[in-house]
Amino acid sequence: MKRTFFVLLLLAAGTALRAQTLGGEYRLSRVFPVEGRQGIAADSNYYYVSGSTVLYKYDKQGRLVARNGQPFEGLPLAANHIGDIDVWNGEIYAGIETFEDGKGENIQVAVYDADDLTWKRSIDWEPSSGQVEVCGLAVDRDRNMVWMADWVDGRYLYGYALATGKYVRKVHLRPVPQWQQG
């Protein structure tokens, strides 16, 4: 019994020591070119890329498998720009707005089907939140929320409930980042 305990203890200690060194060195294994330069998201099978006006889907070998060249079609508010994206539970969440002269209007989180990149619904922006632009977006899987960042005023992150689409709150960032993207 003591011998088994000692072997298990050594194994656990060795695993703990090994775990501390994991991730210490990264090597680029390959590169493949993609269209788009606004945002990228990945699930276990695909990469999703946003251009300013197009959504793309690539397999893990870098082959283009889907493209939506009309991502603003059907949106409840006029838009001309896709920014950052995230993917969760078979849906792509995209920060979308009408962006002109450094100002965003009609901010929304457009939700697309990850299979065929078609628009499903939008989460409306809450103007009283103080947000004036959307530069970054992330799905908070633990809290079932989507968070947006603002390039013009980077002091806050703005959170919306995924279940209801309603604005929940903003979080003050300290120290304040400036001109963050994606």
Residue ranges and their predicted role:
Residues 26-27, 68-78, 119-132, 169-182:
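Surface-exposed loop and turn segments in beta-propeller and other repeat-based domains
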Residues 27-53:
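Beta-strand-rich domains and repeat architectures in extracellular enzymes and scaffolds
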Residues 34-41, 76-84, 129-139, 178-182:
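Repeated scaffold domains used in trafficking and secretory/extracellular systems
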Residues 44-45, 89-90, 142-144:
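Short coil/turn segments that connect the beta-strands within blades of beta-propeller domains
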Residues 48-72:
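Beta-propeller domains
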Residues 52, 97-99, 149-153:
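Short loop/turn segments immediately following the C-termini of beta-strands
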Residues 55-56, 101-110, 154-159:
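Structural motif
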Residues 64-99:
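Blade-loop segments of beta-propeller domains
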